[in-house]
Every structure is written in structure tokens, then in C-alpha cells.
């Protein structure tokens, strides 16, 4: 099996800006088709055309771990303020402090990163080693049968089901790590105003109007129960091959 990953970016004011990314785990026979799809996708994003596209094809030599996909539910809110209240209620019910939640929102809004921030679920302290890059969840794929089942489930709720599938895949891997309590995600796509929170206890909760249309600020925060071996957690999220079933 092979891990195939794409990242597209563009330089603005001498700073590399993330445009789009995607990845999966494939048989050798699928790679050529997937490469064409990823290259096309890199140039068809609403955030504009990139000036740099990096595609990585890497053989997987270790056993691929399987994890269960989180159950999916959708909550409809009318504004970012209403969405925040819902998020606060849900996350506090599983032990995440207000301080941690405010810290996560502050990092997402003020310090845009390629990856996710790690937030202590009680103190709100940032725990990731590289606070510029963050943590990038990688080497993931969803089983075809599970993917088709979820697409049927959400097809009437989303015009971009593939985007939802990719997010569920990430969230399911993240939630499978014992010390991760929950995840908060807000898309940096200006046209996409649906975000989510996810955890083993809550499942994957899609939340409408988590931000206003046109806003490009977004990111991910993983709430972590301490003590936690951050190096081990980072290695699992970034390097352990996982198939979501």
C-alpha cells in the first residue's frame, strides 16, 4: 500500500499560504488515477490557484491500524454566536474548561497554522512543540464501503460530501488516541461555514454557521488530557497509517 499526499500553496507577502490539501492510502494500481485527481483538485480551489504543488507518494511498510468512524450528527445554528454557545455546552459536558475553549478560539483566529494546535483541556496551555507549523494529521484513508454509506447519509445535508468524508476521517483518527478528549475545527475556506467538534463521547457533530461567509480564518484544535507524551501523540497523528472503517 502507498500513502499519497498533496499540498498546494501560494506565496503572499513573502509568506506561504495554504490553498488546499488531500491524501489517502492506495494500491499501486490506483496511484496514477489518484495523482491526476489530486493535481486537478489543487488548481480548482475557491482560495485561488497555487504557485506550488507538492505531491508525495510513499510506500507504507508497517501494519495499517483500523479505527471506527465516528457517528455523524448535524446541528443547525443561526450565527457564530449561537454556534459558540452550542460548542461550549457540548465540550464542557465532557470536561473541557472554558479557559481551554477560549484558548483554542484565540489560537485559531490569531495564529493561523498549517496544522492543528494542541490545547491542555483544563489549563488551556498550548502543548505542540512547533507552534508555527502545528500538528498535521496524515496517512489516513476511509474504507470504500463506509465512505459510500456516509455519503448516502449526508447527501441531503451537504453539497460537498467528499469534504465531510475527509473531515470525518481525520476526526476519527484523532479521537482514537486515548489522551485526546475532543477536536474543534473551523474551515479556512471562505465559502464554507460549517465546522465541527468531535470526540469519542460526542461523535462527529457538524455545526452550521460556525463562522460568517467570506472569512478566511480557520484551523483545528485538539484538546488533550494531561499528562500526555506529546512526542508519542504527534508521531501517531502524523505518521501512523490508519484506515477508518
UniProtKB/Swiss-Prot annotation:
Q: Which UniProt keywords apply?
A: ATP-binding, Biotin biosynthesis, Ligase, Magnesium, Nucleotide-binding
EC number per UniProt: 6.2.1.14
Top-level enzyme category:
ligase
Q: Which GO terms describe its molecular function?
A: 6-carboxyhexanoate-CoA ligase activity; ATP binding; magnesium ion binding
The reaction(s) this protein catalyses: heptanedioate + ATP + CoA = 6-carboxyhexanoyl-CoA + AMP + diphosphate
One biological process term from GO is: biotin biosynthetic process
Q: In which pathway does it act?
A: Metabolic intermediate metabolism; pimeloyl-CoA biosynthesis; pimeloyl-CoA from pimelate: step 1/1
Q: Does the keyword Nucleotide-binding apply?
A: yes
The organism's place on the tree of life at top rank:
Bacteria
Pfam hit, one: BioW
Known cofactor(s): Mg(2+)
Asked whether the keyword Magnesium is assigned, the reply is yes
- Please give the positions of the paired cysteines in each disulfide bond: none
Subunit structure comment from the entry: Homodimer.
What this protein is reported to do is described as: Catalyzes the transformation of pimelate into pimeloyl-CoA with concomitant hydrolysis of ATP to AMP.
NCBIfam families xrefs = bioW (TIGR01204), PRK01322.1 (NF002360)
Similarity annotation? Belongs to the BioW family.
Q: What name appears for this protein in its UniProt entry?
A: 6-carboxyhexanoate--CoA ligase
**What is the organism of origin for this protein?**
Thermodesulfovibrio yellowstonii (strain ATCC 51303 / DSM 11347 / YP87)
Q: What is the lineage of its organism?
A: Bacteria, Pseudomonadati, Nitrospirota, Thermodesulfovibrionia, Thermodesulfovibrionales
Amino acid at each position: 500500500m502507498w500513502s499519497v499526499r498533496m499540498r498546494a500553496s501560494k506565496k503572499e507577502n513573502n509568506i506561504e499560504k495554504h490553498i488546499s490539501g488531500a491524501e489517502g492510502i492506495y494500491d499501486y494500481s490506483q496511484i496514477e488515477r489518484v495523482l491526476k485527481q489530486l493535481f486537478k483538485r489543487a488548481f480548482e480551489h475557491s482560495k485561488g490557484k497555487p504557485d506550488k504543488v507538492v505531491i508525495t507518494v510513499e510506500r507504507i511498510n508497517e501494519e495499517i491500524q483500523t479505527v471506527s468512524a465516528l457517528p455523524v450528527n448535524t446541528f443547525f445554528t443561526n450565527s457564530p454566536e449561537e454556534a459558540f454557545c452550542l460548542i461550549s455546552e457540548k465540550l464542557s459536558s465532557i470536561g473541557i474548561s472554558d479557559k481551554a475553549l477560549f484558548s483554542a478560539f484565540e489560537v485559531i483566529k490569531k495564529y493561523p497554522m498549517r496544522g492543528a494546535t494542541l490545547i491542555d483541556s483544563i489549563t488551556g496551555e498550548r502543548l505542540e512543540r512547533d507552534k508555527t507549523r502545528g500538528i498535521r494529521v496524515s496517512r489516513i484513508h476511509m474504507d470504500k464501503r463506509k465512505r459510500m454509506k456516509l455519503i448516502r447519509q449526508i447527501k441531503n445535508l451537504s453539497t460537498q460530501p467528499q469534504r465531510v468524508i475527509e473531515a470525518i476521517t481525520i476526526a476519527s483518527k484523532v479521537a482514537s488516541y486515548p489522551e485526546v478528549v475532543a477536536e474543534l475545527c473551523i474551515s479556512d475556506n471562505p465559502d464554507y461555514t460549517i465546522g465541527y467538534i468531535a470526540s469519542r463521547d460526542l461523535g462527529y457533530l457538524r455545526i452550521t454557521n460556525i463562522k460568517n461567509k467570506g472569512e478566511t480564518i480557520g484551523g483545528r484544535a485538539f484538546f488533550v488530557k494531561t499528562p500526555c507524551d506529546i512526542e508519542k501523540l504527534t508521531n501517531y497523528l502524523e505518521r501512523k497509517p490508519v484506515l477508518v472503517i
